[in-house]
Amino acid sequence: MDPCECSKTGTCNCGGSCTCKNCSCTTCTKSCCPCCPSGCPKCASGCVCKGKTCDTTCCQ
């Protein structure tokens, strides 16, 4: 299951406790872009959120 359903519903869940709304990700497959740390404009494809944020290696 793709945790990022942004392109379909505008909402998505990642990392279990992280819920993103009105996200604009179109290429993320295992993460929600707004879950990335501050200063991280986009999560890399295949990135998995850890807790409520992606770790910095997810940034691209």
From Swiss-Prot:
A divalent metal cation 6 binds at C36, C40, C43, C59. Coiled coil: none annotated. A divalent metal cation 5 binds at C33, C35, C36, C49. Residues 1-28 are annotated as: Beta. The keyword Transcription regulation does not apply. Residues 29-60 are annotated as: Alpha. A divalent metal cation 4 binds at C32, C33, C43, C47. A divalent metal cation 7 binds at C49, C54, C58, C59. The modification N-acetylmethionine is found at M1. The keyword Transferase does not apply. Keywords: Acetylation, Copper, Metal-binding, Metal-thiolate cluster. InterPro entries: Metalthion_dom_sf (IPR017854), Metalthion_dom_sf_vert (IPR023587), Metalthion_vert (IPR000006), Metalthion_vert_metal_BS (IPR018064). A divalent metal cation 2 binds at C6, C12, C14, C25. GO terms for molecular function: metal ion binding. A divalent metal cation 3 binds at C14, C18, C23, C28. A divalent metal cation 1 binds at C4, C6, C20, C23. Transmembrane segments: none annotated. Belongs to the metallothionein superfamily. Type 1 family. Class I metallothioneins contain 2 metal-binding domains: four divalent ions are chelated within cluster A of the alpha domain and are coordinated via cysteinyl thiolate bridges to 11 cysteine ligands. Cluster B, the corresponding region within the beta domain, can ligate three divalent ions to 9 cysteines. Metallothioneins have a high content of cysteine residues that bind various heavy metals. This is Metallothionein. The lineage of its organism: Eukaryota, Metazoa, Chordata, Craniata, Vertebrata. The gene is mt.
